[in-house]
A protein has these predicted regions:
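A residue-level marker of the well-folded mature domains of exported/periplasmic proteins
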Residues: 1-291
Length: 291
């Protein structure tokens, strides 16, 4: 395993740039013993995949990065780990597929899962079906004035309830979390369609007991593969089941104003689900909602 330095008691997640000589102060080499042989594990290179316009998690930038790295030290690259499938697939298609270098991503996007049959080595499903449900279910419960756990850990009047193995609630942060699951060559066929709702929470709410409400929901980057191709389609399926009339706003992944400029009349909505470009920009939204 690798050992990363700490900053103020937390693991330092900064990218190392290039670290082919192992001299980085951010990450230290690790070792791995297999069949009596000890191997050095080194983070050769890492960077934030941000394009020239400022958009992060950028697939094209990742594809360019692996081409640059492979030209400089490609024979040293034994495995690629990407923080999302959009970037992982860009590197897989640009270089690692042709060079048989194991590549792993995150998100379990449909194209990445399908690519496992063609050599993409694996990804992580963050249970987008559960994430999307939780997003809208918390809003539905708040609008109905019922216990926040209704239809989540506690069965609702339509029979909706999540199983314990797909989510957990953290009391300290008052947050629900969907649990991750590895997607590999052994189970990828179960994840080929990433837009299927979770069956135990796919029961229609009664419109009399749960009348239609209007919701404004934004996604910080409409160009993000996971958000646009997996998360939003799931939201659109659940909003019908939960009797929510949702206006979806897709941002550019760069500026808060691109989103807030499209919230001109907050009073027409009953609830809001906000996905900020930067997590320290909450005031941009609360200022509008307080008008």
């Amino acid at each position: 395993m690798l050992f990363r330095s700490e900053v103020d008691g937390a693991i330092n997640s900064d990218p190392v740039g290039t670290n082919t000589d192992g001299s980085s102060t951010i990450v230290q080499d690790g070792t791995l013993e297999i069949n009596g042989t000890t191997y050095t594990v080194r983070e050769l290179a890492s960077q934030e995949m941000k394009n020239s316009a400022g958009a992060t998690w950028d697939a094209a930038t990742a594809g360019n990065a692996i081409n640059t790295w492979s030209a400089s030290f490609g024979d040293q690259i034994d495995v690629i780990a990407s923080n999302n499938d959009g970037m992982g697939m860009a590197m897989f298609n640009a270089w690692s597929s042709a060079n048989s270098v194991p590549t792993f991503g995150y998100d379990a996007n449909s194209d990445a899962v399908a690519a496992i049959a063609d050599g993409y080595d694996g990804t992580i499903s963050q249970h987008a079906d559960v994430q999307a449900y939780l997003t809208l279910r918390v809003l539905r419960n708040a609008l109905d004035g019922v216990d926040i756990d209704t239809g989540i850990g506690t069965e609702d009047d339509a029979g909706n309830v999540l199983s314990d193995d797909v989510f957990y609630y953290d009391e300290a942060s008052r947050s629900y979390y969907a649990l991750n699951v590895a997607v590999t060559a052994e189970n990828y066929e179960d994840f080929l369609d990433s837009t299927v709702t979770d069956a135990p929470v796919s029961n229609q709410l009664d419109a009399t007991a749960h009348p239609t409400k209007s919701v404004w929901l934004n996604i910080y980057n409409a160009a993000d593969n996971f958000l646009s191709a997996t998360y939003q389609p799931l939201l659109e399926k659940y909003d019908d089941l939960l009797n929510l009339n949702v206006d979806y706003i897709g941002g550019d992944g760069q500026t808060e104003a691109n989103i807030t400029n499209r919230l001109s009349n907050p009073s027409q909505y009953d609830a809001f689900a906000i996905n900020m470009v930067k997590t320290d920009n909450a005031a941009s939204y609360t200022a509008l909602l307080n008008q």
